[in-house]
């Protein structure tokens, strides 16, 4: 199931001031995150440039998990960000993008949620994963790349993934124009990023984020290597940490860089 998908068509579908205004497209690359960082380092690529590939041979997710998709079925892209804020704030970019993807998917008519910190889900199955990486310049962020993989037109998944992953096609019963989906994500990301940099935290986006948080008020298991525990997800704080209430009423602030969170009874 293929659609027209190239630099020109993605550009035509992207109506923004800066996010994805410049599009780079390749049939194949190692990973769009690596490509974006190389382009910044070697070619002077700048803020908001978007790198899109039909296939990536070395795509990765959180905790270095491999990620790949059949050609002509997914969106694999990375946006380059050159921020002024401190490196400690960079992990929040994952949540900004997660909200943006969820809003785009909602706009095309699907009931969508965010599985904190970096997955977007439909029918409690993963439809999108996000990986943010940064390159330092002295003690500042030189650039950050936010990598996004969206399952768009896949008609099936391998048996071992079928209970955890889905696609826009499987959930809606019809294919989607991937360029239009990219354009919607960029529109929402530009709006959300501009709100984020005003405060350099998620205070302005928190109400919208929590409305879409699939884990909200759900039992979760925090997979901390030293001290795994169960509790109830109560939302996020302004720093993007998940607030988990233990059985005794104490509330933990869970940092996404250190642990995974799973639903007690399912992936979410």
Where is each model-derived feature located?
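N-terminal lobe of the biotin/lipoate ligase/transferase fold
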Residues: 1-103, 128, 176, 251, ...
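Short loop/edge segments at beta-strand edges and connector loops
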Residues: 27, 114-116
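Long, positively charged amphipathic alpha-helical accessory segments at protein N-termini or as interdomain linkers
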Residues: 1-4, 18, 92-112, 122-268
């Amino acid at each position: 199931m293929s659609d027209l998908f190239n630099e020109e068509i993605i550009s035509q579908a992207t109506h923004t001031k800066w996010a994805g205004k410049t599009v780079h497209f390749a049939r194949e690359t190692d990973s769009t995150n690596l490509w974006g960082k190389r382009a910044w380092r070697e070619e002077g690529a700048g803020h908001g440039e978007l790198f899109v590939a039909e296939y990536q041979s070395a795509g990765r997710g959180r905790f270095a998990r491999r990620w790949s998709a059949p050609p002509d079925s997914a969106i694999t892209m990375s946006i380059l960000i050159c921020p002024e804020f401190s490196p400690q704030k960079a992990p929040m970019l994952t949540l900004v993008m997660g909200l943006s993807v969820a809003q785009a998917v909602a706009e095309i008519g699907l009931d969508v949620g965010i599985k904190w910190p970096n997955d977007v889900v439909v029918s409690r199955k993963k439809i999108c994963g996000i990986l943010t990486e940064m390159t330092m310049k002295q003690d500042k962020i030189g650039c950050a790349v936010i990598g996004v993989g969206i399952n768009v037109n896949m008609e099936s998944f391998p048996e071992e993934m079928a209970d955890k992953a889905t696609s826009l096609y499987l959930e809606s019963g019809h294919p989607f124009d991937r360029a239009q989906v990219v354009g919607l994500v960029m529109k929402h990301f530009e709006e959300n990023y501009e709100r984020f940099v005003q405060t350099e935290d998620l205070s302005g986006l928190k109400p919208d984020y929590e409305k879409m948080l699939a884990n909200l008020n759900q039992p979760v298991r925090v997979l901390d290597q030293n001290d795994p525990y169960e509790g109830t997800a109560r939302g996020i704080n302004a720093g993007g940490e998940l607030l988990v209430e233990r059985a005794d009423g104490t509330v933990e602030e869970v940092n996404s860089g250190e642990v995974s969170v799973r639903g007690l009874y399912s992936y979410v």
